[in-house]
């Protein structure tokens, strides 16, 4: 379980124990150590305490400017990052891409130059092209936080998923975690595989063959302790955590699925399938949920669902990332 401080003194003690952070940018979790993941979890516990106070704000990043640069639509992630920045007293520069010079053909690097000229200390970036945040990180003095790039990565989502699990389970070591859905097009799945495997979880991926990354089959192992199943009953059996993934219809080429109804028939997590998991299994989803496609309504709104908790915890995780990347020692 993650620690949440009870007093200001405990807050200072917990943060003083967070040492050795080396990341200027957060691009994915493949280059994070287990110890660094633990640092994020511990810091997020402090931030969650701040968010539970009557005044949900501290001056840790007062005087800093955080820009949000989203080339794709977003409600949860963008709002979560903005609230996280404001909770740390940072100024937020929200660039509306559709109404900016980007719509006139301005390049990504030119846009980043403009944001830095305006004083941005950090840039939260979502882009449809995999690798775009890496290009930005090599170009900018500002810290870059990847809020999702193409099919590649969504590190803050994976971190909040880990944090949410640890609010309910004592550790991830040995936990059986099943991810069901569009693995091929899911940046959430890719970052979760890295993060969860580093924390010692045993991961099962479940999807139709056409929605698995190319080159995989049921005998493949692409990460330590990761296996692949195309039968949802086998995949869910004995699981401690079951995570549905959104069917990425906007990213798919025609012909990957015979139809949405057929997908739901064979890969929807419903109450009957969920009974195969452990009685205290958690149900998760990065959102937005296509109800009665990936998850049945009864599962989405059932007692085992922690989907809304994931949203709440996302703010704490993003506060932690801002705090750690800024190098701040104040809270």
Curated annotation (Swiss-Prot):
Binding site for carbamoyl phosphate: 76-77, 126, 154, 157, 287-288
Domain of life: Bacteria
EC number of the protein: 2.1.3.2
GO cellular component, one term: cytosol
Enzyme type, top EC level: transferase
UniProt record, GO biological process: 'de novo' pyrimidine nucleobase biosynthetic process; 'de novo' UMP biosynthetic process; amino acid metabolic process
The entry's keywords: Pyrimidine biosynthesis, Transferase
Catalytic activity: carbamoyl phosphate + L-aspartate = N-carbamoyl-L-aspartate + phosphate + H(+)
Gene Ontology molecular function, alphabetical: amino acid binding; aspartate carbamoyltransferase activity
Tagged with keyword Magnesium: no
Pathway(s) annotated for this protein in UniProt: Pyrimidine metabolism; UMP biosynthesis via de novo pathway; (S)-dihydroorotate from bicarbonate: step 2/3
Listed Pfam families: OTCace, OTCace_N
Residue positions binding L-aspartate: 104, 187, 246
Keyword ATP-binding in annotation: no
Subunit structure: Heterododecamer (2C3:3R2) of six catalytic PyrB chains organized as two trimers (C3), and six regulatory PyrI chains organized as three dimers (R2).
Function of the molecule: Catalyzes the condensation of carbamoyl phosphate and aspartate to form carbamoyl aspartate and inorganic phosphate, the committed step in the de novo pyrimidine nucleotide biosynthesis pathway.
Family assignment from sequence similarity: Belongs to the aspartate/ornithine carbamoyltransferase superfamily. ATCase family.
HAMAP family cross-referenced by the UniProt entry: Asp_carb_tr
Name by which UniProt lists this protein: Aspartate carbamoyltransferase catalytic subunit
Species this protein is from: Dehalococcoides mccartyi (strain ATCC BAA-2266 / KCTC 15142 / 195) (Dehalococcoides ethenogenes (strain 195))
């Amino acid at each position: 379980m993650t620690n949440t401080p009870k007093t200001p003194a405990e807050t200072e003690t917990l943060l003083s124990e967070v040492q050795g952070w080396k990341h200027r940018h957060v691009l994915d979790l493949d280059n994070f150590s287990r110890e660094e993941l633990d640092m994020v979890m511990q810091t997020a516990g402090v931030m969650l305490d701040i968010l539970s106070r009557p005044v949900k704000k501290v001056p840790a990043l007062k005087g800093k400017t955080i820009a949000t640069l989203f080339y794709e639509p977003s409600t949860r992630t963008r709002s979560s990052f903005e609230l996280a920045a404001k909770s740390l007293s940072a100024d937020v520069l929200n660039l509306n891409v559709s109404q900016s010079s980007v719509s006139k053909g301005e390049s990504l690097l030119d846009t980043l130059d403009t944001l830095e000229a305006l004083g941005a200390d950090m840039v939260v970036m979502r882009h449809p092209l995999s690798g775009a945040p890496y290009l930005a990180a090599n170009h900018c003095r500002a810290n870059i936080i990847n809020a999702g790039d193409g099919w590649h990565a969504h590190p803050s989502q994976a971190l909040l998923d880990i944090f949410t699990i640890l609010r309910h389970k004592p550790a991830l070591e040995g936990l059986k975690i099943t991810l069901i859905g569009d693995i091929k097009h899911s940046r959430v799945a890719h970052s979760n595989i890295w993060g969860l495997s580093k924390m010692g979880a045993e991961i099962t991926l479940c999807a139709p063959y056409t929605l698995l990354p190319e080159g995989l089959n049921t005998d493949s192992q692409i990460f330590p302790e990761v296996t692949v199943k195309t039968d949802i009953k086998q995949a869910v059996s004995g699981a401690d955590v079951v995570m549905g993934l959104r069917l990425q219809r906007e990213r798919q080429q025609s012909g990957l699925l015979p139809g949405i109804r057929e997908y739901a028939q064979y890969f929807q997590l419903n109450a009957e399938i969920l009974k195969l998991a452990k009685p205290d299994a958690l149900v998760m989803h990065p959102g937005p949920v296509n109800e009665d496609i990936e998850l049945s309504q009864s599962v989405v709104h059932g007692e085992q669902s922690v989907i809304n908790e994931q949203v709440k915890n996302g703010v704490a995780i993003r506060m932690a990332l801002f705090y750690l990347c800024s190098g701040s020692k104040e809270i």
